[in-house]
Structure formats: C-alpha cells, structure tokens
Curated annotation (Swiss-Prot):
Pathway: Amino-acid biosynthesis; L-methionine biosynthesis via de novo pathway; L-cystathionine from O-succinyl-L-homoserine: step 1/1. The modification N6-(pyridoxal phosphate)lysine is found at residue 429. It is an enzyme of class 2 (transferase). The gene is met-7. It comes from Neurospora crassa (strain ATCC 24698 / 74-OR23-1A / CBS 708.71 / DSM 1257 / FGSC 987). Keywords: Amino-acid biosynthesis, Methionine biosynthesis, Pyridoxal phosphate, Transferase. One of its GO terms (biological process) is methionine biosynthetic process. Catalyzes the formation of L-cystathionine from O-succinyl-L-homoserine (OSHS) and L-cysteine, via a gamma-replacement reaction. In the absence of thiol, catalyzes gamma-elimination to form 2-oxobutanoate, succinate and ammonia. This is Cystathionine gamma-synthase. InterPro entries: Cys/Met-Metab_PyrdxlP-dep_enz (IPR000277), PyrdxlP-dep_Trfase (IPR015424), PyrdxlP-dep_Trfase_major (IPR015421), PyrdxlP-dep_Trfase_small (IPR015422), Trans-sulfuration_enzymes (IPR051750).
Amino acid sequence: MPPFELGDPIPSETAHAVSVSLPTWSANVGYEEGQDWVVKRMATGYPRFFIHRTIQAFAADIVATHVSTKAKRTSDITAMLFPTPTIASRCVDFIRSRAPADVCSNIEVVNLVLDMSDPEARALEPLCPSISAVIMPQDGFPFAKQYWQHSGDGVSSRRAEFCHGLFKDGLLRPDTELRNAAVSAAKPCRGPKRYQRQASLDAGGNQQTIMHGHIHRATGETAMIQETSRFLEERFGRNLDLSFVHPAKSAIKRRIAGALRSADHDLGGSPSLSEKQMSSNTRGIANLREEDIYLFPCGMNAIFHAHRALYSIRTPPGSTPLKSVNFGFPYVDTLKILEKFNPSGALFYGHGSKSDLDDLETRLESGERYLALFCEFPGNPLLTCPDLVRIRELADKYEFAVVVDETIGTFANVNVLQFADIVVSSLTKIFSGDCNVMGGGAIFNPNSRYYSALKSFVQQQLEDTYWPEDVIFMERNSRDFVARIDRVNANAEAICRVLQDHPLVKTLYYPKYNDSRANYEAVKLPQGGYGGLISVVLKGKKQAVAFYDAIETAKGPSLGTNFTLTSPYVLLAHYQELDWAEQYGVDRNLIRISVGLEGTDELINVFTRALKVAEEQSQYP
C-alpha cells in the first residue's frame, strides 16, 4: 500500500472515507490535543468523532440562512444535522439536560423538507431527503457533539452532500415556510418509515403496504421510482437505481443471518429477496426471519437503539430504571451510552473475568436486578471473551437481557446469537471492508423472552434512517465478506507468529492465545477462525513509538478494513483517561493491528522490518 501523508483520507482520494492517516505517534498525540499542525491538515476523520467537511459546510449554510432572518451573528451560532425531527428532539433533550441555561434557552430546530410544489422536488419524493438542524449557541456544540458521537444518530456524509445540493437549489426548505405556502396540490413526503406493517393510500391514490421494513408498491409508484432514478442520474449525476434499495437491504440482512451465499447478489432478478422465504441460516436459530434483522446508519446507532428499546420495554411509567451491566472493557462509546442515557447509570466490570462474573452472581443472589448486560465478543482492544454460556444461565435465572456486540468476532467465525437476546454489529468494519461507508446491524433473537415487546417497540418507535446511497454501497462491498474473512484469519495468525516469540513483545492479545480462549471455542464455528484484530504491547514506550512510526501499513482509526490498519488505539480512544484505562489492564502504549488482505509473505516482511527498527531503538539509552 502506498504511504499516506498526515491527514489524508484512508482510502486515498475517497470522498466518504471512514479513516484518516495519522502516520506517526506524535500525530496521534497532536490530534488528541487539538494541535494545529495535525488538525488543520485533516481532510477527514472517523465520522462519529470528526464531522465530515460536507456536513460542516451544509450546517454553515443553514446557519447563515437562518440567522439572516434573526439579526444574529453567524459566528455566535452553530448547527448539528440529523435525519428526522424526532432525532433532533432527542438531541435537544440531551443538551438541555446538561448545558447552561443560557444555551438551553436559545436552541431551535429547523426541519428542511422537500418543497413539493416544485415538479423537480416531486420527482425526489421516494428518497425523502429530509434534514433537521439543531441550531444553538457555540457554547452548546460540545454537548451536541457528545450526543452525535455516542448515539450515532447524525446524518451520513452522503445524505448531507445530496441534501445540501437540494438546499442550494431551493428544493429543500424549512417546513415552517412551506406550511404558509399554497402547496395543497403537492404530494406529501411521508418521511422515514417505521418498521411496521400497515396499508395505506399515498396522496396520489396508489396503494402501498409496509411490511417488515420493506415497501411493496403498486405499479404507479414503481414507475415513480424509475422516474426518480432517471432524474437523479440526469439532474445530479448520480447512478442510483432506487428499485435496488429494498432488495439491497434484504440482501444485507440475509448475509447477516448467514442465509445468503456470497454469489447471490443479482438484485435485478425476478422476485425480490424480501419476497422469498429465508429457508436456512448459519445462526442456529431455525425460526429466525429477515424481519428480525434491522439496519442502522452505523454500529454505535445499533447499540444505542438496542439500549433504548430495552430501557423502554423494561421501565414501567413511574418506576426507577434498572442499571445495565457493561461486562468487559468496551469500545469507548458503549459504556457512555449505558451511563448517560439511563439515570441509574451502569455497573462496569472492566476486566470481564471469572471473578467479575462471580461478583455479579453474588449481587443477583442478594436481590439486585439489572436491565441488561452488554458485552463484546471478543472485546476491543484486549480481545478478551466473556463466558456467554454462564452469562446466559444467569440472565435466564435472574431475568435480564443480554446484548452481544459481535463486530470483532464476526458471524463468519462465531455464533453468539444462541446466547443473546440482541446481537449488534458495526457493518462499517469487516462486513464492508472498503472503508467508505458506515452501517450497523441488530438481530432480535426470536426465542428471547423480550422478543414480542422489542418488536412492538420497533413498530412504534424506530425510524429507518439508513440513507439509500449508503445501503447500495454496503450491499456491494459485502458480497465477498465470507471469502475475505477466511483470508484475514490466515493473515492474522501469520502475524501473531511473527510477534509471539519476539523478545521485544511484552504481551500479545489474540483470541487464540488469550486466557479466555475456552470461551471463544465454545461459540466458534467449525469453519471459523480467530478474527483479524490483534493487539500488542512492546517492552517500552520508546520501542512502541519506533515500531509504529516504522510500520509500512495504513495508520489511522477504525478496523476491519481490506488493508492492514495500525493504530495506537488507547491513545485515540482514551487519551483523557489513560490512568483509568490502565486500571483494567489496558496499556497506554498498546498498538492495535487490524489485519487486511495483503499477501501473507508481504505482511510478514512488513512486521519483521518494523520490529527490527524497534529493536535498534532499544539499543540506545
């Protein structure tokens, strides 16, 4: 892979890249400390931490237009963009629960919708490209950014790019303006659909049925979708066939279920995938259906809504909410969700060890009760695997839900659904692989005691906000997912062999070699491997810095890319709490390696050379 300069998107020349090049240890520190020599060179960043430039530009234009009618200075105002009014309202509630009174009293929401009196806008109606902007004083931005980062509810860069063009052309306008306009002849935009069954007539008289998140349209609306697709290509230069969006969602869901072979990706064929019976799957749950799988704009959004759903169905009106349990050292925002979106907070077991599980059992035996237990399998970055068999036994006995994040293990290597009520995953990672689109997934176990209540919550409360362009990219990227996993598994084991016996390596973290290997083996599929994520701690910081600076891979945030990606993960994820992380055995100088598809011999040489540089550095005092 060619070297990346500081701040370059990874992959290079990719408008919607998910990672960014931080090629030296000092660049990572500079990023965390907000130093200009790093921040000003960043073309992009990881989307939940770095707001994409296209989103920033759109927000600035909304603010400029809005304040021109309010006699305020643009420099005093900022905006955060969300796909729907409901989500924007949740962000406002979050800000008002934390921000000073002068900030809270000056928050507004501007909802931009299609001006359906314009014939061009009517052609875009099936896309429903809405935007809700939370406009606030600059002092409110840090609170809005917390919501954006933790929840994953923000707009995607592709949605923002498309909607910004409509806004500039006058096709997307504030709903308050349109309410006062004479638009009675226009068809209303239905807005993001909820995952529910319903039959209705649209404003044009065509019957439509929404079943399990898929819209089945009459002939008139099918023709409209075809017209919209032609219009998108002619007017905006976008080759986006909307007739493929719903089959693409179906294909993604079936891949997640393990019910679709890699070769089955002809979305233009006869009956759509959503209309076929899902006859078998690799999850070991015979009654699992496609409609038990939900797609989200990113993985953290899947976790956020899993928690939101369980909180809702298990917290009767007027009752004190139950705490959740975070078992094992988690990805940074998972714990933040459990702590910040539940007034009762969370019980945190950072080691995820047998003694932690013993302590939890003691608490349960003494009468303590919990909303849900959230865990990763394996954990990030230590690759520790919780004892899912025992956790399931405790959950059944003491009635709490189990949510397992399978992002790192992947369903091609492990089967965790049998022990979970909900399984979540970041599709942004190895499922996509191309590092150019975000996505998340959640599976409801149909055998869960909470299944019916969860389905009811979804039908009433969950909005489908996964932008169609992102869906199309995710479906295309994921077609060869299983084959890529096999290659990554083999490459990861080869790199482990290079690291395992090297004198500079203090600790190697990988499911095959960790103390918790038995827990991994309990759910490992017969054809599965141990995944593509490795963490390593060298003998000292000096050696870690030398190794990182010398390694000839892409270097930046994220994981699960088709190319090897290296990161001083703890610096990036926990820079403000390094001492806290070390209490749980997470070394501040840990280096995380996401293994890619390069040739095995090539990777062995790359890691051998970097270790040699680190070795030479250790010769100097």
